[in-house]
């Protein structure tokens, strides 16, 4: 690269894309946009960001391992510098998304579309919810305590999990529960089509009972995003399979690639985050 090149006239492609996605997000904050369209913009922003981490961030991660001295032709940044800049730009976008979602949720509450907190339900509502949990959710849960009998499992890409920090006789363990994919995520109250509880909130509320003889020190809803940086035309993936079979194999491989992002809901997860970052070999800022 020419050392006299003025990089102020060009911009890193990934940072430019994040600015574009921010404009998508800000559409959700416009009062003149119908409320369900605002929810749609929030969904588009989130889906865009998922794909960005899977493909673009995944690719830069790979580049940082193979060619750590490579410099981007538009910004003169190394892969590590690009990842640092992406992290700096993404964090405020998450905060903005949460702020906008909180506003939209408040407006939905005025229309009686309410995400109920289990702690605030009446005794009768809790009784019905407990019955639903025991009949429909509990039978399909597969809780695991990581240890000699259960080594650290493969955590699927973009599937919500409940992570728990467990304590038994001063020994700390890690537990995990995958959210069942076949169940509806929004559970509406009978006879009331607008008040609902999320599936993960129900499991999070009752999951202590699944770990007998343990005390639950921390618990949180989490999600892992894995790199999807596979080129189906690369020679190492060539085969004699028909194209459909070949692409199915590629999709399966994408599901097992390196984690590039670790997301949590809420704030009570400091030790869980530290443990998973170590086990998944991922920076705590990712």
PLM segments and residue spans:
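N-terminal non-catalytic structural scaffold regions of very large proteins
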Residues: 2-286
């Amino acid at each position: 690269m020419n050392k006299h090149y003025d990089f102020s006239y060009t911009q890193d492609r990934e940072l430019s894309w994040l600015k574009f996605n921010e404009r998508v997000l800000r559409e959700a904050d416009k009062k003149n946009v119908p409320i369900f369209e605002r929810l749609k913009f929030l969904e588009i922003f989130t889906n865009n960001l998922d794909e960005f981490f899977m493909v673009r961030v995944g690719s830069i991660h790979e580049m940082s391992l193979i060619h750590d001295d490579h410099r981007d032709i538009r910004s003169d940044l190394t892969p590590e510098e690009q990842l640092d800049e992406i992290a700096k730009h993404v964090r405020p976008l998450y905060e903005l998304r949460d702020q906008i979602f909180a506003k939209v949720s408040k407006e939905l509450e005025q229309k009686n579309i309410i995400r109920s907190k289990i702690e605030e339900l009446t005794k009768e509502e809790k009784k019905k919810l407990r019955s639903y949990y025991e009949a429909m959710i509990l039978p399909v849960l597969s809780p695991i305590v990581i240890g000699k009998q259960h080594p650290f499992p493969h955590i699927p890409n973009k599937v919500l999990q409940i992570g728990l920090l467990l304590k038994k006789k001063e020994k700390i363990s890690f537990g995990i529960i995958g959210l069942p994919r076949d169940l509806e995520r929004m559970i509406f109250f009978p006879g009331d089509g607008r008040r609902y509880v999320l599936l993960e909130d129900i499991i999070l509320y009752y999951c202590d009972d699944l770990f007998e003889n343990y005390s639950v020190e921390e618990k949180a809803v989490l999600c892992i995003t894995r790199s999807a940086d596979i080129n189906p035309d690369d020679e190492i993936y060539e085969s004699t399979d028909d194209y459909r079979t070949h692409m199915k194999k590629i999709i399966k491989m994408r599901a097992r690639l390196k984690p590039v992002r670790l997301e949590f809901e809420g704030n009570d997860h400091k030790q869980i985050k530290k443990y998973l970052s170590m086990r998944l070999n991922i920076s705590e800022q990712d």
